[in-house]
Amino acid sequence: MRTHPMKLVTVVAESEVEHRLTEELLLLGAAGFTVVEGRGAGTRHARPSDLPGSNVRIETVVPAAVAERILERLSEHWFADYSLIAYVSDVQVVRTRKYDAQQPSTPTGADHAAR
């Protein structure tokens, strides 16, 4: 099966900023995202699970140029004021149209018909 290179951008942040972060991801060119609640420990120590709120892991698969824009925005406007981390992974996807906001959406099956 033919795959295509993309970037997986993962942001872990406090749940209070989830809505603002996901809005920015879309404005920066992400076609969508997935949010998962979580907890853990890091350089700022563990976040007690009995406190209100939680952490969220926000993931989006995007072209390399969009990943770069997202990281630049996080670096310039988020890292200094919010407790969050971000990282990028190389991934391979089957249907690039699902992940590229610049490509027009196609009806189900159209990706197959285009081959």
Where are these regions (language model features)?
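Positively charged, small/polar-rich N-terminal and surface patches that mediate targeting and assembly
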Residues: M1-R115
